[in-house]
Amino acid sequence: MGYRQLIDWKAFYAEEAEIELLNDPEEAAARERLLEEISAKVIDYNAHINEYNLAQHCREIQARGLVFKPISKRTALRKWDAFFASELTAETKREICYSSFKWHMFSYEKVAARKGSDAKRAFNRCRKGAAYLFIQCTDEAWYIENAQLLTAADLGVDYSFERADVYIFDAKGKWAYARTHESDCGPYFLRKP
């Protein structure tokens, strides 16, 4: 399960390029209209399937006993910044586009962290109690009472680009884990001394 693509978009865009070469404007307009309808339906279908899969995934996690309490994302962001980014200057944050992607603090090596499979192992092995979780490109954030039941695999599923950058961190700021939308960046794990 995870984020799915139902259509070969490369072939779709090649078809669009072919339409531009047509000498018959009426036929070109008809094909463009049909392609737009196909595109809209496929996007709607993918969104439906991905939302369903996400809901199923959340139910599976909650069935294991995890308790997610919705909180203000602003609260989670303030805590993240205080715990993990307080050493970064405003200039550094601008340079690395920190406000758009908090994980850039790790990828630009402004804050040392484990990465890749090493980060996943470290996250799975660390002692977890209460934690905060937020998603970069949405307004979603939660307080998790029993994060010890959560694994890197639980956080490693893409259901959409908007939900791809996931951050979870200890409620006392002892550790942090960031899963990114970039397949060659991260995930990252930071444990404070």
PLM features per residue range, with description:
Residues 1-193:
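Structured alpha/beta or helical-core interaction and ligand-binding surfaces enriched in interleaved
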